[in-house]
Amino acid sequence: MGIRNFEKIRIKLASPEKILEWSHGEVTKPETINYRTLNPERDGLFCEIIFGPTKDWECSCGKYKRMRYKGLVCEKCGVEVTRAKVRRERMGHITLASPVSHIWYSKGSPNKMSLIIGISSKELESVLYFARYIVTSSQESTVEVGKILTEKEYKLLKQLYGNKFEAYMGADGILKLLTAIDLEKLRDELENELAEANSAQKRKKLVKRLKIVRDFIASGNRPEWMILTNVPVIPAELRPMVQLDGGRFATSDLNDLYRRVINRNNRLKKLLEIRAPEIVVKNEKRMLQEAVDALIDNGRRGKPVVAQNNRELKSLSDMLKGKQGRFRQNLLGKRVDYSARSVIVVGPSLKMNQCGIPKKMALELYKPFIMRELVRRELANNIKMAKKLVEESDDKVWAVIEDVIADHPVLLNRAPTLHRLSIQAFQPVLIEGKAIRLHPLVCSAFNADFDGDQMAVHLTLSPESMMEAKLLMFAPNNIISPSSGEPIAVPSQDMVMGCFYMTKERPGEKGEGKLFSNIEQVITAYQNDKVGTHALIKVRMNGELIETTPGRVLFNEILPEIDRNYHKTYGKKEIKSLIKSLYEAHGFTETAELINRVKNFGYHYGTFAGVSVGIEDLEVPPKKKSLLNQADKEVAQIDKDYKSGKIINEERYRKTIEVWSRTTEAVTDAMMKNLDEFNPVYMMATSGARGNVSQMRQLAGMRGNMADTQGRTIEVPIKANFREGLTVLEFFMSSHGARKGLADTALRTADSGYLTRRLVDISHEVIVNEEDCHTHEGIEVEALVGANGKIIEKLSERINGRVLAEDLVHKGKKIAKRNTMIHKDLLDKIEELGIKKVKIRSPLTCALEKGVCQKCYGMDLSNYNEILLGEAVGVVAAQSIGEPGTQLTMRTFHTGGVAGAATVVNSKKAENDGEVSFRDIKTIEINGEDVVVSQGGKIIIADNEHEVDSGSVIRVTEGQKVKEGDVLVTFDPYHIPIISSHDGKVQYRHFTPKNIRDEKYDVHEYLVVRSVDSVDSEPRVHILDKKNEKLATYNIPYGAYMMVRDGAKVKKGDIIAKIIKLGEGTKDITGGLPRVQELFEARNPKGKATLAEIDGRIEILTTKKKQMRVVNVRSLENPEEFKEYLIPMGERLVVTDGLKIKAGDKITEGAISPYDVLNIKGLVAAEQFILESVQQVYRDQGVTVNDKHIEIIVKQMFRKVRIIDSGASLFLEDEVIEKRVVDLENKKLEEQGKALIKYEPVIQGITKAAVNTGSFISAASFQETTKVLSNAAIEGKVDYLEGLKENVILGKKIPAGTGFNKYKSIKVRYNTDDKPEEE
């Protein structure tokens, strides 16, 4: 069995015997090497007797040289004759004069050592560092074992009891206690105590202790092994000492740390020999303890040990930790040979599967292959001569090199490698020069451009790797992105420009209206300049006359016949969908050739079109002036309304901004209409070749609203554009936004990279493991609708390529069977029948213990076939979510901080057809319109509820039939008014509004704020009649603006107060990426909403508790049952008294927490909530990520459960364990007829889930390395190497793709008929 051939790996504590077993000798001297002879000192840290010879097959004194003395130990110098490489594997040890504790276990929380002994970690520390005594044995009942004594107490007790008890300081005492522990007995005691314990605090403590005791028993570790009596010394070559140019030495920090341990240990030995006074010995023992602490984990306790230049020394723990540690630096990312790197330039003449490699580079990369070929062709007599020929780049070499590289693909990689398309394989083509040539169509996959980007080339060496490169990684196989199923190798820029220009039509061109009998005639006429490129002509094709243009005829010539369309103008979008449909029909190879033809066509005619940009092309629309004047008038009117007290400041601000947003749009429209269809800038933007309308608006329209430093929109817009030029003030206002964009980019890129890393860490073990898990579960999917009723993701997009979880039935007719994959035809059918909900299989409900099955995953998005077994879908999911993260971060960059207009919503529309019914709506008539005066009423159509705020105008009548999209109510977009339904006099109760004066306009506003007199009761307004009788009472929330004064008269329909609606700020991905992180980390959002836990009716009580409002939700079925919520006075309620409400609905304003959704609505709802919230962020940014990728991550977040009742199992309550482990245990318990385990699902954020993953190697390489390893060692954890990371770290083939475990057992059989001929 080879060293590589193992299935699992285990980590345990090392016993003192084990350390000696590893060792090849004791290091007793702190010396390293002799400064004169430069030979290692005997018994020192580099001793050749212990660690092996420094030169191959040669002993230290030189008596025995050469290989024939292999294995001999020289009698003169005692060194074994062997390879020098053993200095990398032979260990030594230091025998300590006094035991010391291992800092990983004596410090940190939970503190293992103190838990096992049953003292606090503070007490443990005081004993270990010689401040207190601990009693280790006692015959006296008053002095119990484990008691902590100060110096005074110890002396007093010694006088009293003499030798009836023993107490020690330092690790000696702890060692004695730990050795004496009987783990089984301790476990039974703790279990009994736990059964009797009644306080939660005590139970928690006992559970912690019991867990550690059980871990020790299960793993076969002994507690006293946490105390070191021998310290292992790692092999000499792993802590090297090298001579620098100036004769000085550079050495690893570890050598310094070891030297301190050895020095102190030797000094302690001497002190003990000469029987030094107690106090000196104790001090030396403490220093030894500190030296060993520093060696294991420097800086963990006390001041870190520093070198001369005040730099902290790197200890053994630091060698493992962090990005520079062993795991991430050397095991997960290695530097590789057979690689090269250079600048890239465009190679438009290459085929899709080719790349240009400079001759010099190829010569070096393929060196051994060229040498072999030279010898094989007898152009060189031996390898040595061949090497010389290659190095002199002899003419013979050029003859060979073409053949050598002919079938030998290379891999190209561009950093940052964000997804799997950042590494692709190409067939090399030799070129002159020193730059690598890249095919223009793969640029978007690599995210490369030619402004100085560099790329790395790697050579495939083994036949297997060459095979995989050709079959899986060739560029033509990567036309489609695995994250969304959309084409990614799409022509861009010049190529689009050429195709767009050629397929446009222009009335009145030369030869318009001519008739042609066939395509050849058109082309001849065009080449002879008898007809213009864009002229509308008629051509006979397949027996019918088709109206088209010569340009379109030429473009369609390069397409297969079935895909031709002579009426279309091809911009980037059209070309993209063309590529998609081509791929669906013809597969990769043909599509690749076709895209190449489109590329050549585009470049050729793009050059021929001669599109260029001059400043005259940016025409400022003549209408701009009048539009701006109109806007200025509107703003003046708004200011007037504000001064007269009709509106409040916030409304004035928002209305002003809305006017300017609208004007900016109008100017943009005017600009676009004003431009000629063939204006170069217009063509570039509309075709998708370069730039967009928002950039054009800034160049030739107006810049519009800008955001200030706080992210609020400035109410004075920038009226100028870049062609007219900005004034100094305008420039100053806009510079902040532009710079913020750049700063954001820099900060966010790092964030996004870290997000990707966490996602990979949590999902790398998800592999397609089986064909079918035979579950009947699934998730119900419908179109994803945003807050403003806009469809974010269509149903067809969500279910494309998924598998049905149950038969699809519509009106009693079966349309498709269960387990059918949904493809294009079925999608069309579903849309045609108007089906709104479909139940599909999903990774979330997959029943496999590990990984997912083919059916639950569905289609492989990168090739539209069923996903293959062994596919690493987890990593693909992580990359698909992480890669756009980096793009999202760079969104603000090009538009230069222009504030995005939040669209103003001022009406509610019906979401479906049906009959209207009202619930809890009170209206009064004002100016002939029905105005709502109640809060929280609803309009119900079929089973869809539409909430109606007060102040809304109702546009439908009860019982009216409406169609989807009909307007139900209109309302003011900026505020919710509180309207008087009576004539009368106003009386304020329990509040005095704060008077706010606006200096600029000299206007007073009255804001309702919390004051001393309103502590106990809510602010209200009574409307009184002439006899001062109450006609009506209105609750006024804090933050409302009073529109009438105390004692004023009001008429029916007057506005008493206004509540500001929360506005959307500028939407920047700043909202985006942090939001995605918040969701995946399952953090409680800031200002979270209170949700109702049961269905019922709202009761808002007038009494207060703890100065908070009381809101009850009383169940409708059982009026006895209700839930009480205490709402702080400042929070805004979104419910009213008597409103019917469902479990999970909001009671107060705010963001929803996933934990609340889980507790109230259960697991499925919580999973869907995270999935849909993430999807919303990505869709807002215009990024398509398929649901299934997010589902895989969410599945990993929910893989753990919390034990509520452990039944007959050995689990402890409140323990968080993988669901699959608990389910297995329950299966066993069920078979034995014992009590089952009860549990509840828990959400773990991605960081936590990655640290708590089943594999300790993967977890240690992620974060908190020392903690993970120390815990795993105590548990004696076994890593079954199921994920990808563990296998990469151990240098094994990953268990995915061609390394998938099921493929290992495949036997190759020949069919009897076609056996290969015997030679």
From Swiss-Prot:
Catalytic activity field: RNA(n) + a ribonucleoside 5'-triphosphate = RNA(n+1) + diphosphate
Binding positions (Zn(2+) 1): 59, 61, 74, 77
Cofactor(s) essential for the protein: Mg(2+); Zn(2+)
Recorded superkingdom: Bacteria
Residues annotated for Zn(2+) 2 binding in this entry: 773, 846, 853, 856
Keyword Metal-binding recorded: yes
List of residues binding Mg(2+): 449, 451, 453
Cofactor binding mode and count: Binds 1 Mg(2+) ion per subunit. Binds 2 Zn(2+) ions per subunit.
Gene3D superfamilies the UniProt entry points to: 1.10.132.30, 1.10.150.390, 1.10.1790.20, 1.10.40.90, 2.40.40.20, 2.40.50.100, RNA polymerase II, clamp domain, RNA polymerase Rpb1, domain 3
Entry-linked NCBIfam families: rpoC_TIGR (TIGR02386)
Function: DNA-dependent RNA polymerase catalyzes the transcription of DNA into RNA using the four ribonucleoside triphosphates as substrates.
Family the entry assigns: Belongs to the RNA polymerase beta' chain family.
Designated name of the protein: DNA-directed RNA polymerase subunit beta'
Organism of provenance: Fusobacterium nucleatum subsp. nucleatum (strain ATCC 25586 / DSM 15643 / BCRC 10681 / CIP 101130 / JCM 8532 / KCTC 2640 / LMG 13131 / VPI 4355)
Gene: rpoC
